[in-house]
C-alpha cells in the first residue's frame, strides 16, 4: 500500500509539468524562462496607436503617397487687369506673338497670360449660360405676355376688297384722228356722245375703262428759241 502511494505521489498531475523533468528533457527551457522573466515588462499598447499613420521610407520621404504640387496664386494689379481686359475685348484667342507682346507690357510671363485667358473665357461662358438658363424654362404662353395686345395696337388694317372682274370693252375700233393744221399738235375733238353707254353687268363686275387717247407725233424739227 505504501509503495502504491509513493508511485501516485511521484506521478505528475494532469496538466502540470514536473520541475524535475524540465532540466532533463528540455535543458534550454530554464534559460529561456529566466531571460523572459529578467526582461522589462512589456509596454502597454494604446488603442488605435499606429493606425492610419503614414509610413516613411528610409530616405526620409513619405512612402505610398505622391508629393502634391502646391499651386501658386498670381495676384494681378489693377493696371494689369485693365490691360488684360482690353486685350480680351479685342481678341479672345490671342496667338503666341500677341501673348508675348502683352507679357512685355504687363510684366507677366506668357504662361500666366495664357492661363488668364483660359479662365476668362470659361468665366464668360458661365455668365452666358446663367443668362440663358431662366429663358429656357419659359413656355410659349409666357412669351406672348411680352407682346402687345391687339386692342392696344394703334394701327388697324382694313380687310382687302374683293377682286373685280373686268369685261372687254364693247367698242374695240380705233379712235378717229383729225389731221394736224399748221404743223401744230391738234387734239382730237371729243364729242359728248363718244363715250359708249354702259350696259348692265352682273352684280359685282364692272366694265374695264376705255383706253387712253393716242396723240399723233409731230415730225417737224423743233424750233429754236434763239
Swiss-Prot record:
Top-level lineage group: Eukaryota
Keyword presence, Chaperone? no
Q: List, in alphabetical order, the Gene Ontology terms for molecular function in this entry.
A: DNA-binding transcription factor activity, RNA polymerase II-specific; RNA polymerase II cis-regulatory region sequence-specific DNA binding
- Chain intervals with Low complexity compositional bias: 216-226
Q: Does the keyword DNA-binding apply?
A: yes
Which portions of the chain have biased composition (kind: Basic and acidic residues)? Answer: 1-13
Regions crossing the membrane: none
Note the SUPFAM superfamilies from the entry: Homeodomain-like
Q: Which GO terms describe its cellular component?
A: nucleus; transcription regulator complex
Q: Which PANTHER family match?
A: HOMEOBOX PROTEIN PROPHET OF PIT-1
- Give the protein's biological function: Possibly involved in the ontogenesis of pituitary gonadotropes, as well as somatotropes, lactotropes and caudomedial thyrotropes.
Q: What is this protein called?
A: Homeobox protein prophet of Pit-1
Please name the source species. Theropithecus gelada (Gelada baboon)
Amino acid at each position: 500500500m505504501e509503495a502504491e502511494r509513493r508511485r501516485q505521489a511521484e506521478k505528475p498531475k494532469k496538466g502540470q509539468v514536473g520541475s524535475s523533468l524540465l532540466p532533463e528533457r528540455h535543458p534550454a527551457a530554464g534559460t529561456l524562462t529566466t531571460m523572459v522573466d529578467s526582461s522589462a515588462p512589456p509596454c502597454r499598447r494604446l488603442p488605435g496607436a499606429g493606425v492610419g499613420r503614414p509610413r516613411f521610407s528610409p530616405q526620409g520621404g513619405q512612402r505610398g503617397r505622391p508629393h502634391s504640387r502646391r499651386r501658386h496664386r498670381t495676384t494681378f494689379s489693377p493696371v494689369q487687369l485693365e490691360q488684360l481686359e482690353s486685350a480680351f475685348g479685342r481678341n479672345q484667342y490671342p496667338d503666341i506673338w500677341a501673348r508675348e507682346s502683352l507679357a512685355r507690357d504687363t510684366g507677366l510671363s506668357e504662361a500666366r497670360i495664357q492661363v488668364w485667358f483660359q479662365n476668362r473665357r470659361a468665366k464668360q461662358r458661365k455668365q452666358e449660360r446663367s443668362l440663358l438658363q431662366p429663358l429656357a424654362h419659359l413656355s410659349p404662353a409666357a412669351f406672348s405676355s411680352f407682346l402687345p395686345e391687339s386692342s392696344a395696337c394703334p394701327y388697324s388694317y382694313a380687310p382687302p376688297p374683293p377682286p373685280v372682274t373686268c369685261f372687254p370693252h364693247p367698242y374695240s375700233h380705233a379712235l378717229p384722228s383729225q389731221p394736224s393744221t399748221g404743223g401744230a399738235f391738234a387734239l382730237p375733238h371729243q364729242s359728248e356722245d363718244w363715250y359708249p353707254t354702259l350696259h348692265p353687268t352682273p352684280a359685282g363686275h364692272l366694265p374695264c375703262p376705255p383706253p387712253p387717247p393716242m396723240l399723233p407725233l409731230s415730225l417737224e424739227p423743233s424750233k429754236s428759241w434763239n
